[in-house]
Swiss-Prot record:
It is a multi-pass membrane protein. NDH is composed of at least 16 different subunits, 5 of which are encoded in the nucleus. The keyword rRNA-binding does not apply. The gene is ndhA. It comes from Populus trichocarpa (Western balsam poplar). This is NAD(P)H-quinone oxidoreductase subunit 1, chloroplastic. Its EC number is 7.1.1.-. Belongs to the complex I subunit 1 family.
Length: 365
């Protein structure tokens, strides 16, 4: 069988077209992921700058002002400094656990952003079990902290890792029960469905008013999960030097701070999504898709998505003032007080709140 030149050229052009389509497919898949990572990076820089400015205002002092206008580049300068510092390893520590621990803490928190709807149809993974996937993923982070503490071969680090694990277990259960109550109210565990369930009555339809007890418990539990004051026992300076971070330096030390602010941002985003209506305009009977005519007008679709993202971020950063202010307001708890608050106070109340929510949903059928 003889194949002429035209056939060979057709085969070559087809194979070239197929390879180009594969490349375009990979690029199209990576674009939303890279966009999300870039947005998260900018969000963390904004949080660090906000915290420093708010802290300076509370303490009546001047915050960062030399690195960039109003000190906005100070966090970037600190990160660059840590990037070029030497990475030290404990002489008798477990090098593998010591190196893997910070990565697990950061990656597990980063994965949580995949189920957050920043705007209408602007979510990386719209799953039916979105909120519970976040809880499952976030429960992996304490394993990384425990590995870091154990791999350091240092009593302060190991105690800090144990405290982080105990604190996470204690407050994960009330947090899960609050999320389960929200799922019952919305008849779905998808983050997108939960936001849309709050859209009908505007500001009055927020789950904040339907679940005030759950909101308070969720806020306290998320503070404990983020290890923010008054729940920063795993790294209490007066007791454990720096907890599981004691032996770390350089970029690995910086990863723990990145994980802390990632966790703070994702917790605030979930508060905005679960309790504050997400991307919706706070006007009764007007939702973002209807207001900007998503189905017909492409320009309106782009503008509406942008407005939804801005609304979500405004709610998130306004809520961030509360945990930042709490840091400089309340003293640190003792370990026994922390565990008693989680197991003897928040757990029974969150369970009672879940039973009340279930009863109200059954009677409304």
């Amino acid at each position: 069988m003889i194949i002429d030149t035209t056939t060979v050229q057709a085969i070559n052009s087809f194979s070239r077209l197929k390879s180009l389509n594969e490349v375009y497919g990979i690029i199209w898949m990576l674009v939303p992921i890279l966009t999300l990572v870039l947005g998260i990076t900018i969000g963390i820089l904004v949080i660090v700058w906000l915290e420093r400015e708010i802290s300076a205002g509370i303490q009546q002092r001047i915050g960062p002002e030399y690195a960039g206008p109003f000190g906005v580049l100070q966090a970037l300068a600190d990160g660059t400094k840590l990037l070029f510092k030497e990475n030290l390893f404990p002489s008798r520590g477990d090098t593998r656990l010591f190196s893997i621990g910070p990565s697990i803490a950061v990656i597990s928190t980063l994965l949580s952003y995949s189920v957050i709807p920043f705007g209408y149809h602007f979510v990386l993974a719209d799953l039916n079990i979105g909120v519970f996937l976040w809880i499952a993923i976030s429960s992996i982070a304490p394993i990384g902290l425990l590995m870091s503490g154990y791999g350091s071969n240092n009593k302060y680090s190991f105690l800090g890792g144990l405290r982080a694990a105990a604190q996470s277990i204690s407050y994960e259960i009330p947090l899960t029960l609050c999320v389960l109550s929200i799922s019952l109210l919305s008849n779905s565990s998808s983050t997108v469905d939960i936001v849309e369930a709050q859209s009908k009555y505007g500001l009055g339809g927020w789950n904040l008013w339907r679940q005030p007890i759950g909101f308070i418990i969720f806020f306290i539990s998320s503070l404990a999960e983020c290890e923010r004051l008054p729940f920063d026992l795993p790294e209490a300076e007066e007791e454990l030097v720096a907890g599981y971070q004691t032996e770390y330096s350089g970029i690995k030390f910086g990863l723990f701070y990145v994980a802390s602010y990632l966790n703070l941002l994702v917790s605030s985003l979930f508060v905005a999504v679960l309790y504050l209506g997400g991307w919706n305009i706070s006007i009764p009977y007007i939702s973002v898709p209807e207001f900007f005519d998503f189905e017909i007008n492409k320009v309106g679709r782009v503008f509406g998505t942008t407005m939804g993202i801005l609304i979500t971020l405004v709610k998130t950063y306004l809520f961030l003032f509360i945990p930042i202010t709490t840091r400089w307001t309340l003293p640190r708890l003792r370990m026994d007080q922390l565990l008693n608050l989680g197991w003897k106070f928040l757990l029974p109340i969150s369970l009672g709140n879940l039973l009340l929510t279930t009863s109200s949903q059954l009677f409304s059928l």
